[in-house]
Amino acid sequence: MGKPLADYVKLPELEEYKEWFKDFADLYREDGILQVTWKTLDGPMHHSGMSHRAISQLVRVLSLDYKNEIIIFTHIGDHWMTESDPNGWETYSELPTQRFQHQYFDDTNLIKNMVFDLDVPTIGAIPGSGFHWDSAMLSDITICPEDTWMEVPHAHGGLVPGDGMGLMCQHYFGTKRGNYYMMTARQWTAQQMLDWGMVSEVLPKDQVMARAWEIARMWKTKPYENRTIMSNLAKRPLKKLLVEDLKLHTVSEQYGSLLRIAAGDMGDRNAAQQDEKYISQTNDWRYTFPHMQQAPTRESWAAFRTEPIEWFKKVEAGEAVNPCDPTRPVKPYRPDGE
């Protein structure tokens, strides 16, 4: 056999891109099964323009490494994402180019790369309550613990809920129920997610990660080619959904934000539309108290802008405990206690 004129392009190996993304994800691979644990530095992931972009970038890089045969997506600690970087949105606010790139490219890629770039089986392993659950719910199957509750929070803060979560609610819950939860910001529980088709299994909290690895190892017994083709069939309904509606949703959110900027009423918690860093102050409160699981009212919406701030003051004064405390030490899960 003769020698080809040019060889295959050398792409980065795991150890190299693991270093690239070390501030946003812990990557662990065993027997072709890759566990992606979202984080920021050594603690829980803090929502920011930078993490937004890093998620979509990492997913694209993972798709180029054929040694990643099955991928588990999870989050460090006992919750999904609950924190936000208060200084992580400065470039997001710069007009026109920076904001356009963040909202037109990053917001879309965050969703579509999970489905269109990854051709291998994926598992979303949710450790607990949180927001921006995109990568977990876009996985081929999703599992979560019994104490999980989630929501689409945008409407509370005056935003158009167009980053993809509302679209997935319509898809998984059905149009009317999805519209209701998207337009009211009411939270739903793990059992509701199971009943309505958003998750595949609900488990005791301490069994989620072990179960994710058990499923991945089960899939490994199936021929590589066949399980990969199987995964592409699993992704097809979401591919059709995203082709039809994703860009409309993301651009609608962007358009709504630009209108508020033009009107001069985007800003703090008293503005018509809250800036990202102000919305984020409410995150831990949302997953500490079950208020938002009740049918929302005008009064409860108004309280959303004041009660979390008062609660945080008590936490800072030592008069209340924050179960989502981002300063608690956490470590990524390892199978078999490694």
Model-found features: residue ranges?
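C-terminal alpha-helix plus adjacent terminal tail
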Residues: 1-31, 40, 66, 76-82, ...
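Acidic, divalent-metal-coordinating active-site segment for phosphoryl/phosphodiester hydrolysis
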Residues: 131-134, 185-192
